[in-house]
Amino acid sequence: MIKKCLFPVAGYGTRFLPATKAMPKEILPIVNKPLVQYGVEEASAAGIREFGFVTGRGKRAIEDHFDISYELEHQIAGTGKEEQLQSINELINHHTFAFTRQNEMKGLGHAILTGRNLIGDHAFAVVLADDFCVVEDGDDGVLAQM
């Protein structure tokens, strides 16, 4: 069983301009969650618990999203909004997230090779976080079907 997943998220997001000029495309919201979180949730549903991200300049928001925000939690404590962070906090608490930077943009293959230090010699899945796959209730996600 595959236990690791790599997200090559270093690209410039030019297909989504001007929305991605100052925000990574992977953080663009789909309803109430960023696009990349849907990919992580799908991989998690397939039994994957370790995630590696190959990032680039301007992608710090992805790292911040998959990290605990003590300041935000403190600010919303007692407001009734704590539940809104529940889905991301469950991912953070039950999974491992690691990040490395692709210093030169040389394409998808190079990004995956750059992630080797996160994955090692283990079998792994690759999820392209700008591909949004809709799964009907009760159906397995794309990774679980493989």
Q: What would you call each of these model-derived segments?
A:
Residues M1-A77, K81-E82, G138-Q145:
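N-terminal glycine-rich phosphate-binding loop and ensuing alpha1 helix
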Residues E71-Q75, E82-M146:
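Conserved beta-loop-beta/alpha segment of the NTase-like Rossmann-fold superfamily
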